[in-house]
Amino acid sequence: MGFITKAIPLALAAASVINGAEIMETRAGVQTLADKYIVVMNDGMTDKDFDSHRSWVNRTHRRRLIRRGAKAMGGMKHTYRFPTGLKGYSGHFDEQMINEISKRADVKYIERDARVQINAIEQQDNVPSWGLARVGSKEPGGTTYYYDGTAGEGSTAYVIDTGTDIQHEEFEGRATWGANFVDDMDMDCNGHGTHVSGTIGGKTFGVAKKSNVVAVKVLDCNGSGSNSGVIMGMEWATKDAQQKGADKAVANMSLGGAFSQASNDAAAAIAKGGVFLAVAAGNDNVDAADSSPASEPSICTVAASTEQDSKADFSNFGQVVDVYAPGDSITSAKPGGGSQVLSGTSMATPHVAGLGAYLIGLGKGGGPGLCDTIKQTAIDVIQNPGASTTSKLINNGSGIGFLSFPLNIYEEQWSKLFDL
């Protein structure tokens, strides 16, 4: 499947408390990173107090290394300062140091850092995608995508993923490189991120064909990274969006894993910062309530549907799911040119992020409230959606009377796009 799985610690279910700071324990089988942690500070901490805490950590860590005379731990690596107030850091600390940190009254909780990786990918070359046609039609089985000519113009989509091939012809110069928190190669050497980006803003495969795409790389060529690196990407996207206009921005996270309070808090900080965030529900065919950041209520959680308007057999479900979107055998861009077919809630999610960008182009305004707008325009068609799960499938509103402003409808037929 195309969903990116984060092997993240299970928080809250089992946590030790040392002087008020929880050290989150991990679920059996989770691939944690040895001696690496994420530390989240108390709500409302000032920048001055945060800097003072960080200075204390660095001083204490250095003293411990000198006394130990052992192989050096790396110490503090990433620092998080979300514009909405969430603060924290990650680093490489021994058990004694992390216990010292946990005793601090200004620490809210600590999680073990964990590996992030992608699942197996289904691939088939050079076939047309049905997903776009479904987004623009009230009925299944169509071959034409109906959309307003604004096509997301003026919006920006932050794709937090494996990177994007920004030179791909699908993006017509509208894709740019944003930041890299995993390696020194500003390229998508995996393919997942380019596929996701193409579904959002590609000229052929995109829901919002005139939107801008910003690549935020948090996973390497093998589709692997760390939870701490993903949170850095989330922070960077939030800050950049606020500088350029959060009400014109959307973010896509086609990744997730076991429940993580740090991951959920970072996702909530994006939404609080005024950015619409679409997140994959997951590919384990289980209730997404135990997944992160899918279980964060302030974001838009997306399950995957099939061409027959049924729940994809791999898709997670549950009350936390906001909408369904096409996610089975979706065609989009691949690095180096051309296209490929992938399946997963990873593929469903950019349809929703793209629809958010599309609605921004129509003047509906941005922010987390876009999820409610998307649910209002959705159609009640999904068969067997799963226990306590919505049956709403996204729709762009073209020709079905949901949107309260005039549309200049364009149409694209797959026979034209693919010379069939």
UniProtKB/Swiss-Prot annotation:
Domain Inhibitor I9: 36-118
EC number per UniProt: 3.4.21.-
GO BP terms in the entry: proteolysis
Transmembrane portions of the chain: none
Gene3D superfamilies documented for this protein: Peptidase S8 propeptide/proteinase inhibitor I9, Peptidase S8/S53 domain
Domain Peptidase S8 as annotated: residue spans: 129-413
Keywords recorded for this protein, A-Z: Glycoprotein, Hydrolase, Protease, Secreted, Serine protease, Signal, Virulence, Zymogen
Enzyme class at the top of the EC tree: hydrolase
Major localization class: secreted
Pfam family of the protein (one): Peptidase_S8
GO molecular function: serine-type endopeptidase activity
Subcellular location: Secreted
Signal peptide stretch: 1-20
Gene induction: Expression is up-regulated during infection.
Keyword Hydrolase on entry: yes
Active site: D161, H192, S346
Propeptide span(s): 21-119
InterPro entries the UniProt entry points to: PCSK9_ProteinaseK-like (IPR034193), Peptidase_S8/S53_dom (IPR000209), Peptidase_S8/S53_dom_sf (IPR036852), Peptidase_S8_His-AS (IPR022398), Peptidase_S8_Ser-AS (IPR023828), Peptidase_S8_subtilisin-like (IPR050131), Peptidase_S8_subtilisin-rel (IPR015500), S8pro/Inhibitor_I9 (IPR010259)
Keyword Thylakoid assigned: no
Residues with attached carbohydrate: N222, N252, N396
GO CC annotation: extracellular region
Functional note: Secreted subtilisin-like serine protease with keratinolytic activity that contributes to pathogenicity.
Family: Belongs to the peptidase S8 family.
Protein name, per record: Subtilisin-like protease 7
Organism of provenance: Arthroderma benhamiae (strain ATCC MYA-4681 / CBS 112371)
